[in-house]
């Protein structure tokens, strides 16, 4: 199987599950390959044939993007190291959940949650501790008796009950057989950030007093201007846009560049993504722009941005530009 085949399979599964999908991200490097939405569920999906190809920087950006957009970041792949990913098993890479296409299908199409997670040392299942404790006490069974039956320590049984500690598949099967109840806790693939409140900004690095304001790159100066309008700005390194700008009432995918053919292509992609993420989309042009908008992405020249006084005025400007859609 090639990555291209894998991507088509993932798109097919999400479509069958009722998701609307953005255009595929065709930039390199990229923190996600496709955005998908179904009702209130938003996914940022990264496709990797080998999930070990995910690096820490990309994972960090995926998490930040998902948090800012109120969605969930997942990796879908086919293998890890020298073996294929197992069905109904979830894997973790830098705190990003990873799974194969079959598990994706089971969860979103068949509504079957996985039970098994991969971790160093093997495969594990989380136990419903309250259910285990109730089943044991209902049978007036001591911790020691149950521990000897399963082949673990009393302390381990106690941790299963009080902390829901993960157990091996064999142990869980034994416990379920002893009590005749299901004890495995299903895994919720959707790690949604919930509210759309901005994350707390990281403490800024101490600036070298030798570095002056005019030494900043033009793109950084533009993002600083947007920040001064009242936006919380999250710069990106591997997304089709330069940053996500947000205040208490709006979220804007924000591109910054001089006008060229690449800008038009990215503006198309940003428009598609913004429809899925339910955000605004704007490209700030450093210089002159030949277009007012590309689909739902407004193009605003820097000199126009400099005249805008607050976030509400910027939103109105974006809406006005979208109304003059060029259809490019």
Swiss-Prot record:
Stored SUPFAM superfamilies: lambda repressor-like DNA-binding domains (SSF47413)
Domain HTH cro/C1-type positions: 132-190
Domain of life: Archaea
Gene Ontology MF terms in the entry: DNA binding; DNA-binding transcription factor activity
Family matches, as CDD domains: HTH_XRE
DNA-binding region: 143-162
Alphabetical list of NCBIfam families matching this protein: PRK04140.1
Protein name, per record: Putative HTH-type transcriptional regulatory protein MA_3524
Lineage: Archaea, Methanobacteriati, Methanobacteriota, Stenosarchaea group, Methanomicrobia
């Amino acid at each position: 199987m090639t990555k291209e085949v894998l991507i088509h399979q993932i798109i097919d599964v999400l479509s069958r599950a009722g998701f609307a999908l953005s255009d595929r991200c065709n930039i390199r490097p990229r923190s996600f390959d496709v955005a998908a939405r179904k009702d209130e569920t938003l996914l940022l999906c990264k496709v990797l044939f080998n999930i070990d190809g995910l690096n820490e920087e990309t994972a960090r950006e995926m998490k930040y993007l998902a948090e800012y957009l109120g969605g969930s970041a997942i990796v879908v792949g086919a293998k890890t190291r020298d073996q294929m990913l197992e069905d109904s098993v979830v894997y973790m890479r830098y705190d990003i959940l990873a799974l194969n296409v079959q598990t994706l299908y089971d969860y979103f199409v068949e509504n079957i949650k996985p039970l098994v997670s991969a971790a160093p040392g093997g495969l594990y299942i989380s136990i419903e501790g309250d259910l285990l404790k109730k089943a044991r006490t209902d049978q007036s069974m001591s911790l020691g008796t149950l521990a000897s039956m399963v082949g673990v320590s009393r302390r381990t049984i106690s941790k299963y009950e009080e902390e829901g500690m993960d157990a091996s598949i064999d142990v869980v099967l034994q416990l379920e057989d002893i009590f005749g109840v299901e004890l495995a806790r299903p895994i919720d693939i959707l790690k949604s950030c919930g509210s759309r409140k901005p994350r707390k900004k990281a403490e800024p690095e101490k600036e070298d007093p030798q570095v002056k304001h005019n030494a900043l790159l033009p793109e950084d100066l533009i993002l600083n201007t947007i920040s001064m309008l009242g936006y919380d700005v999250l710069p990106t390194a591997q997304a089709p846009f330069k940053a996500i700008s947000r205040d208490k009432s709006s979220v804007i995918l924000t591109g910054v560049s001089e006008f060229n053919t690449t800008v038009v292509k990215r503006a198309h992609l940003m428009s598609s993504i913004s429809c899925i993420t339910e955000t605004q989309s704007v490209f700030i042009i450093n210089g002159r722009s030949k277009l007012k908008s590309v689909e739902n992405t407004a193009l605003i020249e820097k000199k126009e941005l400099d005249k805008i006084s607050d976030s509400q005025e910027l939103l109105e400007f974006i809406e006005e530009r979208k109304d003059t859609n060029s259809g490019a």
